[in-house]
């Protein structure tokens, strides 16, 4: 979400929060666009003094200008930075193009009071930007493309590579409950990425369904937070415990924004169904 401090400043008149039509009328669309592009370029110079919340504030407005209303799915549970950026952009809703540019420019000015954009008639070259604008590089970590020989079982799990994972588990070359450095199992990863069929494969090989990572979160926490109802239902059907809490004291129904999933989990917990033995037969997915 955007920084409360920034939003408070916006309402003070220094940065528009509800719209500043008079200010927009003082600049032509071309002038505003030119100043916005210069501000986007200058962000690279002030990123080191900006807080994470200020960068998120800028990121959201950059995306609103370049793309418009948020039109991408919510990132997975593991992608914390991606989720924060998505939430900041999503919160803008139908924010106008002009309002987003104006607030972006004014915020950059606040970060560097000595900076001012060039007038339109002065020479100006549009900056080369990375995906999402320069500010993205301050928040977004691009995953390296691994060579096939460098991949491990977790990479295959993230890629939803059924054959590789199934073969490794079937031959016993990999323990189904193996964990990464953060205590996350293959089941955690499959649930985070929404790989329903792969979840079934892993459960077939008797994965510890209530295994907790270093944060105390179970695969059910992950599926709930990432809003995959089919996987939540699958986990519950095979004995996942919806009453387990993570290190912050949250149960799975408390980490999701989905009312449907929250209701499903609470209903399951109230019925005590997680105390029943899991299904005796789980067919291997084709």
UniProtKB/Swiss-Prot annotation:
Family matches, as InterPro entries: Acyl-CoA-binding_protein, Acyl-CoA-binding_sf, Ankyrin_rpt, Ankyrin_rpt-contain_sf, FERM/acyl-CoA-bd_prot_sf
SUPFAM superfamilies in UniProt: Acyl-CoA binding protein (SSF47027), Ankyrin repeat (SSF48403)
Domain ACB: 32-117
UniProt subcellular location: Cytoplasm; Nucleus
Per-repeat ranges for ANK: 182-211, 215-244
Cellular component terms per the entry's GO annotation: cytoplasm; nucleus
Top-level taxon in the UniProt lineage: Eukaryota
Protein name per UniProt: Acyl-CoA-binding domain-containing protein 6
PROSITE patterns: ACB_2 (PS51228), ANK_REP_REGION (PS50297), ANK_REPEAT (PS50088)
Gene: acbd6
Main function: Binds long-chain acyl-coenzyme A molecules with a strong preference for unsaturated C18:1-CoA. Does not bind fatty acids. Plays a role in protein N-myristoylation.
Keyword list, A-Z: ANK repeat, Cytoplasm, Lipid-binding, Nucleus, Repeat
GO molecular function: fatty-acyl-CoA binding; lipid binding
Annotated an acyl-CoA binding sites: 59-63, 85, 104
């Amino acid at each position: 979400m955007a920084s409360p401090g920034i939003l408070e400043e916006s309402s003070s008149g220094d940065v528009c929060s509800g719209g500043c039509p008079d200010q927009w009328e003082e600049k032509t669309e071309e002038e505003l666009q030119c100043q916005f592009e210069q501000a986007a370029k200058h962000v690279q110079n002030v990123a080191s003094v900006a807080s994470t919340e200020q960068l998120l504030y800028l990121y959201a407005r950059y995306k609103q200008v370049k793309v418009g209303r948020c039109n991408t799915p919510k990132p997975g549970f593991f992608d914390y930075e991606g989720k924060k950026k998505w939430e900041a952009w999503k919160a803008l809703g139908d924010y106008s193009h002009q309002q987003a540019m104006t607030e972006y420019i004014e915020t950059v000015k606040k970060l560097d009071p000595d900076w001012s954009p060039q007038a339109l008639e002065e020479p100006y070259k549009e900056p080369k930007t990375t995906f999402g604008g320069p500010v993205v590089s301050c928040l977004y970590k691009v995953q390296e493309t691994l060579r096939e020989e460098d991949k491990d079982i977790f990479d295959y799990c993230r890629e939803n590579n059924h054959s590789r994972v199934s073969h490794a588990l079937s031959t016993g070359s990999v323990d189904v409950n193996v964990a990464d450095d953060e205590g996350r199992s293959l089941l955690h990863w499959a649930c985070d990425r929404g790989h329903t069929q792969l979840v079934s494969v892993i459960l077939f090989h008797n994965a510890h369904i209530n295994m907790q990572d270093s944060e105390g979160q179970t695969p059910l926490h992950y599926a709930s937070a990432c809003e995959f109802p089919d996987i939540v239902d699958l986990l519950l059907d095979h004995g996942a415990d919806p009453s387990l809490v993570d290190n912050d004291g949250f149960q799975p129904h408390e980490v999701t924004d989905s009312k449907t999933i929250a209701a499903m989990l609470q209903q399951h917990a109230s019925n005590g169904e997680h105390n029943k033995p899991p299904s005796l037969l789980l067919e291997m997915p084709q």
